Amino acid sequence: MPFIRRPKRAILIPPLHLTLKDDDKVLVVETVGTLIISGMTPSNLTEKLGLAMKLASAILGGDSHPAFNPLVEIFSGAMEFGASVEKLDFMTRENKVITTYKVARGKAVALSNFPMEKRVGEKSYTTQIRNGSITYTGSFLFSAEHVGLKDNRSLFAAGEGLRESPDMAQAREAFAGSLPKGKNESSRK
């Protein structure tokens, strides 16, 4: 009896944004504000993602919050066009580069089992980075919407593409190395 080999079939798994039904709920994060980075200007996507992760983690208290990835997407996207100024730091007597970015209307979508409805008024958030700091001053709106509404499906697809990019993997590794031991390790595998 001859042994017949069947060709292997490739099983294609469609992206998540195509398998969601129109009535599935997503968490929509919107923000308006000003992002100020002192001490450095991010030059590539990996640096932008790393700085955005650091700031989003400081705002949300860690990276396990469902709004973490949308905020990273909003902040890294806002770091495209900014105004840089050199100012003298009186403590160290060195010139520091201060770059300001405007977040006109940042919006991103994330899948969440329990989307929340919350408005956070204008506040200022600051976190330290090597040779400087990142400050975001702005307001947030967290809302639950259906996937089929407005442009949520395309926003979800763009976010998924960014999360699967090699730049995001490099930024995640650098971000994981910068965290103190014992914090937020359960969410990263």
Swiss-Prot record:
> GO MF terms on file?
structural constituent of virion
InterPro entries reported for this sequence: Rhabdo_matrix
List GO terms (cellular component aspect).
Answer: host cell endomembrane system; membrane; viral envelope; virion membrane
Q: Which Pfam families match?
A: Rhabdo_matrix (PF03397)
State the compartments where it is located.
Virion membrane; Host endomembrane system
Instruction: Note the topology in the membrane.
Output: Peripheral membrane protein
UniProt entry keywords in alphabetical sequence:
Apoptosis, Host membrane, Membrane, Viral envelope protein, Viral matrix protein, Virion
**Isomerase as a keyword?**
no
Residue ranges spanning the membrane: these are none
Signal peptide feature range: none
Job of this protein = Plays a major role in assembly and budding of virion. Completely covers the ribonucleoprotein coil and keep it in condensed bullet-shaped form. Inhibits viral transcription and stimulates replication.
Q: What else is known?
A: Most abundant protein in the virion.
Describe its partners and assembly state.
Answer: Homomultimer. Interacts with nucleoprotein and with the cytoplasmic domain of glycoprotein.
Its family remark reads: Belongs to the novirhabdovirus matrix protein family.
The identity of this protein, by name, is Matrix protein
User: Which organism encodes this protein?
Assistant: Snakehead rhabdovirus
